[in-house]
């Protein structure tokens, strides 16, 4: 409760959304997108969070007051997808007000991210949602991949919303567990 500092980052090497206790130093001349965010949601109240499954797209719903004094809903869409990360401001009709990174036809033939067009979610990758599947479902999907690849890469292609670092950690834990079991069996036989 109370006011909190919200950090939104679309940097390719560290995209994230989180509350922070310290206030980062602001640049002397804020970027245009920052000024637009301040204008549209400054003083607004965060009233909802939405996410499609476990996909790495988070929608922050703000109740704000516009220039005319009317209460309006504005969504700030945070697409946390590595080098394709973006932050998009969307009005209550689902129309893009603006985005940190504009995407036109020269950059993508699949999806435009430009002012005054309807916002569309990134194309589904048809991965497994960990909240709706079992460990057996994941194992089966990994086993059914048609190529041989390291476990961390197979997990990344199979599970929705996980980052490469999480997949590497899962692979490490699986290998550590397998090594401990093998060592235990060998010790028991000695």
Where are these regions (language model features)?
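Phosphate/anion-contacting hairpin/loop surfaces
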Residues: 2-190
């Amino acid at each position: 409760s109370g006011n909190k500092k919200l950090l939104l980052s679309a940097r390719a090497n560290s995209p994230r959304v989180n509350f922070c206790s310290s206030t980062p130093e602001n640049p002397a001349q804020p970027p245009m997108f920052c000024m637009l965010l301040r204008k549209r949601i400054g003083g607004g109240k965060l009233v909802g969070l939405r996410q499609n499954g476990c996909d790495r797209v988070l929608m922050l719903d703000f109740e704000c007051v516009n220039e005319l004094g009317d209460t309006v809903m504005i969504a700030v869409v945070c697409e946390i997808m590595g080098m394709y990360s973006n932050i998009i401001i969307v009005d209550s009709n689902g129309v893009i007000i603006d985005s940190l990174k504009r995407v036109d036809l020269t950059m993508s033939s699949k999806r435009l991210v430009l002012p005054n067009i309807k916002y569309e979610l990134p194309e589904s990758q048809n991965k497994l949602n960990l909240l709706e599947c079992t460990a057996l479902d994941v194992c089966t999907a990994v086993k059914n991949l048609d190529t041989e690849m390291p476990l961390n890469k197979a997990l990344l292609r199979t599970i929705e919303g996980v980052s490469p670092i999480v997949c590497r950690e899962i692979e490490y834990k699986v290998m550590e567990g397998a090594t401990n079991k093998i060592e235990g069996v060998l010790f028991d036989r000695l």
